[in-house]
């Protein structure tokens, strides 16, 4: 006899992964509930991560643009804005996003429960709501999409008013003149750009020997040069020995013997999956040391009726990928298999000032693989559109196979890079000979546009062939 459950599926978390799963399930006729720990839906992406940090970055980059444009600024009266003022702008964007996403759930009749979820057994969840009451829900299947949080090493006192992580930095209400950013990954580099754009002194501590080592080396070098040129001090191959919170700031002692003092510290070195409160032991699951769960190609955990998507399964830890993972998991849960799958070449967008974006292979990877590739380049400063809008910093690089002309990788550094990359990505994904660099020479682009960089880069690369 088939058991009856309250729901066909319960989704834990309402970030991009949870939303993708919830919408995918409900569109296939499933009865679902969504459990969200916080007062507003949207998860870390909407409230502490992607959305507020990109809104911050946009505001800062517009200030920089104004101050550098001789039409508006004569350099005697620079436009200035405080971090706190700009945060008000981000709150407006966050509330629009929250309102819109709330509407998705309401229109699709998804029940939302607020509170902390924990497993009782493989089909039962207990929810502790904000007023302390306990509710039990049962479902045939579950999706764990509870995201991640900034990693807190035990020897750093995050209760100190001048020590922040990448979530709490959005509550910064004093005006720092000098900030130490520990961790030069994507988040560290993005905030280094934001603070430097607000004329704050920045010490960026990198635990590795170069910035964002997963990028094509030229892109990484471009960012390093741009930081250096703007006065960001980068300290490579450093680790902290001790972090000392003092009355007027923070002192960081490095293992190399150096000492740094600043008005505040942003610790941005790693993230931890939010699995510790789920009582996973009750369903025979175990997270690794960073709170992450292992899944198969259909996002199924070792417990067959429990799936996991988003940051909680680790790489690639992107909001864009999490949404797709949720959608794919929903299909697998209803149909037993998923015809869709995550694309092999997921584009990377890094919202530094200027942006970096890439898709496909790097020069270093292709060289190691002994692939006979050629390079086509376009400098933004040679494009009419870039000259008109004053976006002269940057370049587009296309890597393609010398013989087949197949595009193997695209790398872009400069304003709007994360948008520009998708034109090349669309051609790269074409099958049956559609992926060729010659497309960019044989098509007609609007003029003047930034997209025209593809035509310039394609001609540059094809002219190298002999």
Curated annotation (Swiss-Prot):
It is an enzyme of class 1 (oxidoreductase). It catalyses: NAD(+) + NADPH = NADH + NADP(+). GO terms for biological process: 2-oxoglutarate metabolic process; NADP metabolic process. GO terms for cellular component: cytosol. One of its GO terms (molecular function) is flavin adenine dinucleotide binding. FAD binds at residues 36-45. Its main location: cytoplasm. InterPro entries: Class-I_Pyr_Nuc-Dis_Oxidored, FAD/NAD-bd_sf, FAD/NAD-binding_dom, FAD/NAD-linked_Rdtase_dimer_sf, Pyr_nuc-diS_OxRdtase, Pyr_nucl-diS_OxRdtase_dimer, STH_gammaproteobact. Its EC number is 1.6.1.1. The keyword Transferase does not apply. Keywords: Cytoplasm, FAD, Flavoprotein, NAD, NADP, Oxidoreductase. Its cofactor is FAD. Binds 1 FAD per subunit. It is found in: Cytoplasm. PANTHER family: DISULFIDE OXIDOREDUCTASE, SOLUBLE PYRIDINE NUCLEOTIDE TRANSHYDROGENASE. Belongs to the class-I pyridine nucleotide-disulfide oxidoreductase family. Conversion of NADPH, generated by peripheral catabolic pathways, to NADH, which can enter the respiratory chain for energy generation. This is Soluble pyridine nucleotide transhydrogenase. The lineage of its organism: Bacteria, Pseudomonadati, Pseudomonadota, Gammaproteobacteria, Enterobacterales.
């Amino acid at each position: 006899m088939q058991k009856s459950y309250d729901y066909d599926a319960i989704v834990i978390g309402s970030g991009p992964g949870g939303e993708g799963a919830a919408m995918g399930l409900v569109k296939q006729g499933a009865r679902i509930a969504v459990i969200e720990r916080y007062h507003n839906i949207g998860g870390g992406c909407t409230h502490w991560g992607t959305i507020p940090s990109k809104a911050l970055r946009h505001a800062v980059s517009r200030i920089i643009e104004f101050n550098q444009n001789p039409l508006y600024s004569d350099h005697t009266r620079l436009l200035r804005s405080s971090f706190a003022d700009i945060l008000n702008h981000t709150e407006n964007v966050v509330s629009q996003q929250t309102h819109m996403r709330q509407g998705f759930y309401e229109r699709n009749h998804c029940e939302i429960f607020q509170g902390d979820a924990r497993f009782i057994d493989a089909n039962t969840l207990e929810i502790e709501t904000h007023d302390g009451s306990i509710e039990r829900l049962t479902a045939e299947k579950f999706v764990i999409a509870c995201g991640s949080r900034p990693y807190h090493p035990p020897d750093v006192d995050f209760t100190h008013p001048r020590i922040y992580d990448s979530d709490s930095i959005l509550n910064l209400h004093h005006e720092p003149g000098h900030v130490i950013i520990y961790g030069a990954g994507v988040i560290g580099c993005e905030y280094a750009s934001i603070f430097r754009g607000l004329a704050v002194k920045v010490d960026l501590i990198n635990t590795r020997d170069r910035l964002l080592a997963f990028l094509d080396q030229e892109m990484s070098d471009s960012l390093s040069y741009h930081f250096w040129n703007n006065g960001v001090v980068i300290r490579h191959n450093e680790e902290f020995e001790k972090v000392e919170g003092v009355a007027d700031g923070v002192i960081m002692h490095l293992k190399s013997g150096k000492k740094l003092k600043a008005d505040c510290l942003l610790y941005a070195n790693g993230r931890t999956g939010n699995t510790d409160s789920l009582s996973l032991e009750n369903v025979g699951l175990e997270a690794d040391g960073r709170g992450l769960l292992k899944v198969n190609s259909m996002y199924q955990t070792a417990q067959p009726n429990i799936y996991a998507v988003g940051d909680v399964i680790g790489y690639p830890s992107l909001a864009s990928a999490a949404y797709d993972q949720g959608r794919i998991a929903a299909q697998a849960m209803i149909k037993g298999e998923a015809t869709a799958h995550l694309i092999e070449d997921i584009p990377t967008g890094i919202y530094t000032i200027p942006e970096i974006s890439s898709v496909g292979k790097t020069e270093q990877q292709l060289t190691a693989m002994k692939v006979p590739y050629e390079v086509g380049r376009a400098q933004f400063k040679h494009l009419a559109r870039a000259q008109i809008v004053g976006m002269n910093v940057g370049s587009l690089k296309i890597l393609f196979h010398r013989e087949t002309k197949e595009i193997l990788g695209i790398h872009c550094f400069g304003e709007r890079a994360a948008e520009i990359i998708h034109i090349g990505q669309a051609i790269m994904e074409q099958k049956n000979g559609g992926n060729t660099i010659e497309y960019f020479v044989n098509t007609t682009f609007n003029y003047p546009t930034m997209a025209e960089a593809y035509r310039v880069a394609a001609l540059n690369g094809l002219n190298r062939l002999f």
